[in-house]
Design a protein with these regions (language model features):
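Sec-dependent N-terminal signal peptides
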Residues: 3-13
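Non-globular, low-confidence helical/coil segments that flank catalytic cores
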Residues: 6, 17-334
Length: 334
């Protein structure tokens, strides 16, 4: 196994065979897990999480289909936000389909049950064959043409505000800690901010409210973003007004499943955020009802039994972007 510093890996970085004109992001339906493919203008690729294993290879096949649509034949960086089954479970099959140059994670597994140990051992068996990066808050992932900043990992968050950030957050006054907040691998999630010139997208994995609070209270260490990938599949234990109001997104993406994530309270908080125009969802959230789901054009998969359609976001240097729904070919520019 080679464990390299990010600086050393940057020196060794090479562009992939496919070169995108702009930043392209594919939000892949893995039924309430996560898998997001970033294709940089340089052609380098970052895959964040691999969805579930099992289900007759469902999620790796969907990842492969999105990669084919993007013209991607290899993964330069595979980032595993944490070691839960819905984020790392599909790795075995994904690794059979694509060469993976570097593996990024938060460090040791923190859950000691049998299944968690099996998943972590599976992950390390692949990571040890290549380049493994244990990323920490403040690190930069070396993808050409993008600034990919690690904001959270291994239970820690960014120590100081990013350049241009650091404004007081008035919503912090109403924050109340959740006495029932879980302590699990979710809290260890790697969270990243990707900047492409004037475009910024935030993805905090499965972080929940206390770590969101640490990133934006009493000072907003992040600043504002164009797009927010709703935390924890738009779960009720995350997506606090303290975070979402502070980052002031124009668009939110929910990587929810038909019966996982997409919680009404979280949806409403995001929906009511000043300046937000739209929420795009990977699935219609069955338990949330019409009042807490977006209109059909903004949902990639309406039926519970579906083909696993994806959403694609294309961002320009000037900060403008568009989102495309592969189910109905609907596209909207921002």
């Amino acid at each position: 196994m080679r464990v390299l510093s990010l600086c050393a890996l940057l020196a060794a970085s090479a562009a992939s065979l496919y070169a995108a004109k702009n930043l392209e992001i594919y939000f892949i339906d893995v039924e309430g897990g996560q898998s997001t493919l970033f294709v940089a203008p340089s052609g380098e690729t970052l895959l964040m999480d691999t969805g579930y294993g099992g289900f007759n290879h469902r999620d790796p096949e969907r990842i492969a289909a999105a990669a084919k649509a993007a013209g991607v034949k290899k993964i330069d960086f595979l980032l595993i936000s944490h070691y839960h089954a819905d984020h790392v479970g599909g790795l075995y099959d994904v690794a059979q389909k694509f060469p993976i140059r570097a593996f990024i994670d938060h460090g040791p597994n923190t859950e000691m049950d049998k299944d968690s140990k099996v998943r972590f051992n599976m992950y390390t068996s692949f990571a040890e064959k290549g380049t493994r990066i244990v990323a920490k808050p403040g690190d930069t992932i070396p993808i050409k043409s993008l600034d990919v900043k690690v904001l959270a990992g291994a239970g820690q968050t960014l120590a100081a505000p990013l350049p241009g950030a650091g404004q007081p957050n008035p919503d912090c006054a109403t924050y109340r800690p959740d006495p029932d907040e879980e302590t699990s691998e979710n809290q260890q999630s790697l969270g990243i901010l990707i900047t492409y010139s004037n475009f910024r997208i935030l993805d905090l994995g499965d972080l929940t409210s206390s770590h969101e609070h640490d990133l934006v209270c009493p000072l907003n260490k992040i600043g504002t973003v164009n797009v927010f990938v709703a935390s924890h599949h738009m779960g009720a234990a995350a997506n606090t007004p303290q975070l979402v109001h502070a980052i002031h997104p124009k668009v939110a993406i929910a990587d929810n499943g038909p019966r996982k994530g997409g919680k009404p309270q979280a949806w409403q908080t995001v929906h009511d955020t000043p300046g937000l125009e739209d929420i795009w969802q990977l699935h219609y959230a069955i338990g949330a009802g019409k009042d807490h789901n977006s209109a059909d054009p903004f949902i990639a998969n309406i039926e519970e039994q579906c083909e696993g359609k994806w959403l694609r976001l294309t961002a320009e240097k000037d900060g403008t972007f568009k989102v495309y729904n592969s189910r109905n070919k609907y596209e909207k520019s921002y």
